[in-house]
């Protein structure tokens, strides 16, 4: 019995450690075992992007946002144009017509102002913005000061469905650019139309770049729960490719650099932004470090030659919002993958679908978690029953095992041989309870990541003191209940004969509960319910087996 329990705990603990370390490395953070393997290397500002990125930004202007290039004429004064819709409050910087600030209004309910997330921002402590410009000549780019065209209302009124804001560049290289943002009611997708006018006397062949620029500062990441932060690229050829900041630091980023489909994105916990060019239009993809702590990912889209007096229109979409899976699926192919489940995606996606269906009936994410956990335990009941039956059989022969250990304590070889003979005679497999548990581990790990990655948990209440399932329990009631449930579950099993193992089993509930004090309440709720159901199952099966044993007598 003690051998099996030791193996189970070793498997569980090592799985948890390896999972955490793998997640650390895949998200660009130092490994617990080989820190140098993912150590962030210093890089000069404006460094090239790296392997697989030979067509990167190279000639894209790279001064920090808001810094104008030196000119012989006096620099124009940039302004911030504020706007508001039903989902956004934001600011457009007339320097470059850059979307410099974007607050997601629908992420708060007015009662919890801290839930209002500012996605794009450009302050002394944080930079994250979306910008565009032209390459291929001395054409307007994100450093030039634009002027607002037909300045009118900058708020979406009650009877409006769309809000359009247009900005016109100065003439440079015989080219003038008019950039128009279209905001639609209820939508996190922004239309970005770039009209390129050739007001010169010779044909021009510009290239339009669209990029996302941000620092590597994490936002809203729960303690002990690191999620991916950084650029991502999606194409039909390679599908979803995450790019770690650490790989950009070391010029080792590997991703598709040319396509006529897909999108580029910046991903963080719960939220993302993505440039989505028109499908079927050739574009080059780039990602690079442009400052000690500033990175960018973008596309360069060539524009056909424009004759004097003619113009060209380039349309694209900019997504900036929460990682709501169903919404993302309807915006662009593969965009739902920014909600990152890692290597357990194949299991996690169906679990979230089921959780979402349950929520559609009960209307509360906390109760949806409880019911989903109950459903999973019911599905795995046959496996759990097999495990508990094996444990019960081992419990029956534990006194005889202890007697053999005492008898052959000075001869380990004979003791092992005697134990093997006992197992054979009683038809007991000491590892019989392990397999059912191991099979369930991927499912429970997947549910963990579903609850951690789902923005739907953000601000979602359960009952009484739990007002936000994405935050830790403010009074630590759930972690304490989890510690108690773990202790009860441990006490239902026979005490290992080895004193060291016995102490370890008593220590585990305390160790886990301390860690879970800082976990989101939704995750702890799942573990508490899972433990309570496991205790009930084990008690039921053990009692049933005991009743069966007594009947013949």
Curated annotation (Swiss-Prot):
It comes from the Bacteria. It is a multi-pass membrane protein. One of its GO terms (molecular function) is membrane insertase activity. The keyword Amino-acid biosynthesis does not apply. Pfam families: 60KD_IMP, YidC_periplas. The keyword Cell membrane applies. One of its GO terms (biological process) is protein transport. InterPro entries: Membr_insert_YidC (IPR019998), Membr_insert_YidC_N (IPR028053), YidC/ALB3/OXA1/COX18 (IPR001708), YidC/Oxa/ALB_C (IPR028055), YidC_ALB_C (IPR047196), YidC_periplasmic_sf (IPR038221). The chain crosses the membrane at residues 7-24, 365-385, 435-455, 474-494, 509-529. It is found in: Cell inner membrane. Its main location: membrane. Keywords: Cell inner membrane, Cell membrane, Chaperone, Membrane, Protein transport, Transmembrane, Transmembrane helix, Transport. One of its GO terms (cellular component) is plasma membrane. Interacts with the Sec translocase complex via SecD. Specifically interacts with transmembrane segments of nascent integral membrane proteins during membrane integration. HAMAP family: YidC_type1 (MF_01810). This is Membrane protein insertase YidC. The lineage of its organism: Bacteria, Pseudomonadati, Pseudomonadota, Betaproteobacteria, Burkholderiales.
């Amino acid at each position: 019995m003690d051998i099996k329990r030791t193996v189970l705990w070793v498997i569980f603990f090592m799985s948890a450690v390896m999972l955490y370390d793998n997640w650390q490395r895949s998200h660009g953070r130092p490994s617990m075992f080989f820190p140098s393997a993912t150590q962030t290397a210093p890089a000069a500002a404006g460094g090239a992007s790296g392997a697989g990125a030979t067509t990167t930004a190279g000639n894209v202007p790279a001064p920090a946002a808001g810094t104008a290039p030196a000119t012989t004429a006096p620099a124009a004064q940039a302004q911030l144009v504020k706007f508001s819709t039903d989902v956004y409050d934001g600011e457009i910087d007339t320097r470059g017509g850059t979307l410099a600030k974007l607050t997601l209004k629908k992420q708060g309910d007015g009662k919890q102002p801290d839930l209002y997330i500012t996605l794009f921002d450009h302050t002394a402590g944080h930079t994250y913005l979306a910008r565009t410009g032209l390459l291929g000549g001395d054409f307007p780019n994100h450093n030039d000061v634009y002027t607002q065209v037909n300045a009118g209302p900058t708020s979406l009124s009650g009877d409006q469905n769309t809000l359009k804001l247009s900005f016109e560049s100065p003439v440079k290289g015989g080219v003038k650019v008019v950039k128009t943002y279209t905001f639609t009611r209820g939508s996190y997708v922004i239309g970005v139309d770039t009209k390129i006018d050739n007001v010169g006397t010779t044909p021009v062949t510009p290239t339009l770049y669209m990029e996302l620029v941000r620092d590597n500062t994490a936002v809203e990441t729960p303690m002990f729960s690191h999620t991916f932060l950084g650029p991502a690229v999606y194409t039909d050829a390679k599908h979803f490719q995450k790019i770690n900041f650490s790989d950009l630091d070391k010029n080792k980023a590997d991703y598709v650099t040319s396509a006529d489909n897909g999108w580029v994105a910046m991903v963080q916990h719960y939220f993302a932004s993505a440039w989505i060019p028109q499908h079927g239009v050739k574009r080059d993809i780039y990602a690079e470090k442009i400052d000690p702590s500033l990175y960018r990912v973008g596309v360069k889209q060539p524009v056909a030659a424009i004759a004097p007096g003619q113009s060209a229109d380039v349309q694209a979409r900019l997504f900036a919002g929460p990682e709501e899976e169903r919404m993302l699926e309807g915006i662009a192919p593969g965009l739902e993958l920014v909600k990152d489940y890692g290597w357990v995606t194949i299991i996690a996606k169906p679990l979230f679908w089921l959780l979402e269906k349950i929520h559609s009936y009960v209307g509360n994410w906390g109760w949806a978690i409880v019911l989903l956990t109950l459903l999973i335990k019911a599905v795995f009941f046959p496996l759990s029953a097999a495990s508990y039956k094996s444990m019960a059989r081992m419990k029956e022969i534990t006194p005889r095992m202890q007697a053999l250990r005492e008898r052959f304590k000075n001869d380990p070889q004979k003791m092992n041989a005697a134990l093997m003979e006992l197992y054979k005679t009683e038809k007991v497999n000491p590892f019989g309870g392990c397999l059912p548990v191991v099979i369930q581990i991927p499912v429970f790990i997947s549910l963990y990541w579903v609850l951690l990655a789902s923005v739907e948990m953000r601000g979602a209440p359960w009952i009484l003191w739990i007002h936000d399932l994405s935050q830790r329990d403010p009074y630590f009631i759930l972690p304490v209940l989890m510690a108690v449930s773990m202790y009860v579950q441990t006490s239902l099993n026979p005490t290992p004969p080895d004193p060291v193992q016995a102490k370890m089993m008593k220590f585990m509930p305390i160790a886990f509960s301390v860690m879970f004090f800082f976990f989101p309440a939704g995750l702890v709720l799942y573990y508490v319910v899972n433990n309570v159901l496991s205790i009930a199952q084990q008690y039921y099966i053990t009692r049933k087996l005991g009743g069966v044993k007594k009947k013949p007598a």
